[in-house]
């Protein structure tokens, strides 16, 4: 299998399967001299960790990360810093229940990658989905923690803004609420509703989808490049690569098709020292594939978890029709734990774009230009 890496100068390769002994990643291209200890990574892994409440899979994984390489003691400070060499990160799997999959190992689960893995490779790890499992995303979160060290001045935050057909009230958006509820929801009233709503979905043995919004603030103007290195296209590709994601939009996204030209284009005024002030942010902080200095805003849609307790029709690998009930421990809304994953992927893209920008233009052009 190929295509397990992403990024250019900041490059991440993930490895491991859902029920294997461990998962992890190798981060290459991280500059030397950045303080990095396991606690810097663990804080983000803990936000994604399963089994924390009844709205997540009850698989109990500690997700304790180990840094295997790429760091050393700084002779001046005595602290641990990056060396500029590949950083290997390991997360052990400790709570696999492969027996849950024995009875259906030959049956293709509807909505899962079982059939296409067989069609492409002729062999697959049926235990928990193997490589296609969302378990792999823990490695991305670990890599994202390293990326944040490179772009420490950029604040990257995510939130769940829709569950099923129910959207939050954006007038009540409060970032302080995000880590106060199990849904990463910025609207306290919506979070209370989601609790009752998802309880009903869960008890019915079903699942539901969600929409996640990621906002990156303090990224300067100039990151990204035309034509095939566009910042928004790389963010979209990174978010689209997350398990169960079926759609991505930047800024107004598809809603821009409903606007007129005068409504959609973000007007500008002159601020301090001629620096532009944007009167709106329909573009989501990106124009022509290059950051504008405004908040970078991306949203992605996560489909309902395909593993549900209700019986469904399928076929097995021999072509025989079969009814399947998927047992095991699954998220009733996998979109919830996609929030820290989305943050991590945006962090990786921005770190990569920063390094590429620095490599191409150094500190950047002197702006504003003299009259």
From Swiss-Prot:
GO terms for cellular component: cytosol. FMN binds at residues 131-133, 243-244, 288, 303-307, 329. NADP(+) binds at residues 48, 54. It is an enzyme of class 4 (lyase). GO terms for biological process: amino acid biosynthetic process; aromatic amino acid family biosynthetic process; chorismate biosynthetic process. It comes from the Bacteria. Signal peptide: none annotated. Reduced FMN (FMNH(2)). InterPro entries: Chorismate_synth, Chorismate_synth_AroC_sf, Chorismate_synthase_CS. Keywords: Amino-acid biosynthesis, Aromatic amino acid biosynthesis, FAD, Flavoprotein, FMN, Lyase, NADP. Its cofactor is FMNH2. Pathway: Metabolic intermediate biosynthesis; chorismate biosynthesis; chorismate from D-erythrose 4-phosphate and phosphoenolpyruvate: step 7/7. HAMAP family: Chorismate_synth. Belongs to the chorismate synthase family. This reaction introduces a second double bond into the aromatic ring system. This is Chorismate synthase.
